[in-house]
Amino acid sequence: MSDFSLTLVLQFKTSKIINGMANISIKSQKITPFGGIFHVMEKFDHYIGPVVDGELGLRCTTFGYQYSEITRSLMSVYFCGGDCVEDVTSHLMPHLSLHPTLRTCSSDTILRGIKELSTTNTTYTSETGRSYDFNTAVRLNRLLVKILVSTGQLVAGNSYDLDFDHQFIETEKYDAKMTYKKFTGYSPGVAVIGDLIVGIENRDGNANVRFHQQDTLERIFSNLESDDIHVRRARMDCGSCSREIVETIEKHCEHFYIRANRCSSLYDNLLALRGWKREVINGIEYELNSIITEKWEGKAYRLVIQRERRMDGEQDLWEGEYTYRCILTDDYTSTPREIVEFYNLRGGKERIFDDMNNGFGWARLPKSFMAENTVFLLLTAVIRNFYKFLMERLDTKAFGLKKSSRIKAFVFKFISVPAKWIRTARHYVLNIYTDNSSYQNPFTLADG
């Protein structure tokens, strides 16, 4: 904010009430209730904007909007409490356009930009002759990782733990297909490092999760490695338990941990096992064991087994009095307890999908076709990663927030503050009407 300054206006007034009603005075000044958004817009323009335009190129050379401005306008929708792209024109434009230099584009421009960034679907044909569409969006996936590296959220040369899963998004778009969950939609594969989304590939909702998953993972791993980001450990559910997928994962990480799918031949070995060790994990008593098994011909891996006694007392045809869960891994040094506890951390990643659905628009996709909606998924992933970047640097206690707070709380606690732009001494000043002096410098950033 080198061209602007901030003034905190601390006001304490009492209203005189006559006949049960407060006196009301109408002022025509341009005061916005979203005063905190201008901080966010400027940080986005400083940290994210140059990377977006550098990777995607200039959209125009004269008076049109660049892709960084389109992305920032889309960001402002969710940072001001909106839930669909049209909110920027219907409700937010009078407030966002108050910024003296940063332009905000209309919802029509955002949607045109999304269409321009879309790429053609890739069609794969199964052995049975059925065709399934995938959308890889290579350029935007590259942008997603480059932004994380530029903000320091990922550090080149470091190794991280990666989670991969498919998220089923319910929608009734033109090309949405019926999923096994009995609703129409898409089933994008999403890769996550920590609390950050690092890769998304969209696919037809009726495609089996294992179908060409190894190709998706190969592209995600290669994209990370192109920026010198490496995977130390990978966690995945039973949808990734196939020979082709495991061989791909092995090439790109030190260790993998995959939920093994159940089969009758495996239970014969489990029931004959001895030497179970009792462990209490998260308040639940389990019995743990591990064996070396030849999951596929010529491929032996470690199988970590946990079993829990059935509470209802009934016996299953295959499992007997226990419920069995298995983890396939190439980690031969960690104890069974360490492996189970590490794999269980994967459950926390579901919060990310819930956050995207409810806070960043995944529940209300804006376009009619998968290729364009894939662009939207990736742009909102960029926006959420930027939100996590801000929250790590925000003085959260000063605003009654936590580092893990959802964006709805951020809107209420930080964005929603009265403010007014004024021009004085040949430069612009943002007056913020609050008694919270932390607005003077809320973010711990290198540029202040």
Give each language-model segment a name.
Residues 2-183, 189-206, 213-227, 416-448:
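Dynamic "connector" segments at or just before major functional cores
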Residues 22, 255-358, 445-448:
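An anionic, glycine-rich sequence signature occurring as long contiguous blocks
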Residues 363-394, 398-426:
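Basic, amphipathic alpha-helical segments enriched in Lys/Arg and hydrophobic/aromatic residues
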Residues 88, 280, 336-370, 375, ...:
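Short amphipathic alpha-helical "interface-anchor" segments enriched in bulky aromatics
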Residues 15-20, 50-54, 92, 318-323, ...:
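Short acidic (Asp/Glu) and glycine-rich catalytic loops that position anionic groups and cofactors
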Residues 97-98, 112, 169-171, 198, ...:
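Flexible loop/turn segments at secondary-structure boundaries
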Residues 73-74, 88, 106-110, 158-168, ...:
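Short, conserved catalytic/metal-binding motifs centered on acidic residues
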Residues 209-265:
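Domain-level cores of phosphate- or acyl-group-handling catalytic modules
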